[in-house]
Amino acid sequence: MANSRRVEKLAALLKREVSELLVNGIRDERIHQAMITITSVEVSGDLQHAKIFISLFGEEKKKDEVLVGLEEAKGFIRAELAQRLQMRRSPELVFKIDKGMTKGPAVLDLLNALELERKSKDL
């Protein structure tokens, strides 16, 4: 099992390199139909698996196409990562939509409503 510093370093490198690949390395048009942002990367302790959390901005039906494109590009992305990071074995990648990004505005609205309610009770 790798130490936590190595896991964190690999997560940061994966985030940077996958972001670069999404912008410049992948030619699949499905991936470019929505704006993709990598919000975080979680790497397992044995460095064999990586969850890449993404947020997608665009039409709902195009988001599904983007995910299909990412799934099909996984092999290419892993090969590029192995070459760029000079790794004998690159981690298995799993792309997940970051639900926190979509729920954030709703939570802020609830907090603002509670604040207004509290202020009205104080008056």
Curated annotation (Swiss-Prot):
Q: Where in the cell is it found?
A: Cytoplasm
Q: Name one GO molecular function term.
A: ribosomal small subunit binding
Q: Name one GO cellular component term.
A: cytosol
UniProt-listed InterPro entries: KH_dom-like_a/b (IPR015946), RbfA (IPR000238), RbfA_dom_sf (IPR023799), Ribosome-bd_factorA_CS (IPR020053)
Please provide the record's keywords in A-Z order. Cytoplasm, Ribosome biogenesis
Query: Gene3D superfamilies under this entry?
Result: 3.30.300.20
- List this protein's GO terms for biological process: maturation of SSU-rRNA
Classify the main location.
cytoplasm
Recorded superkingdom: Bacteria
Asked whether the keyword Signal is assigned, the reply is: no
Q: What does this chain do? A: One of several proteins that assist in the late maturation steps of the functional core of the 30S ribosomal subunit. Associates with free 30S ribosomal subunits (but not with 30S subunits that are part of 70S ribosomes or polysomes). Required for efficient processing of 16S rRNA. May interact with the 5'-terminal helix region of 16S rRNA.
Q: How does it assemble?
A: Monomer. Binds 30S ribosomal subunits, but not 50S ribosomal subunits or 70S ribosomes.
Family statement drawn from the similarity comment of this UniProt entry: Belongs to the RbfA family.
Q: Which PANTHER family match?
A: RIBOSOME-BINDING FACTOR A, CHLOROPLASTIC-RELATED (PTHR33515:SF1)
Query: What is the name attached to this protein's record?
Result: Ribosome-binding factor A
What species does this protein belong to? Answer: Prochlorococcus marinus (strain NATL2A)
| Taxonomic path | Bacteria, Bacillati, Cyanobacteriota, Cyanophyceae, Synechococcales
Encoding gene (name): rbfA
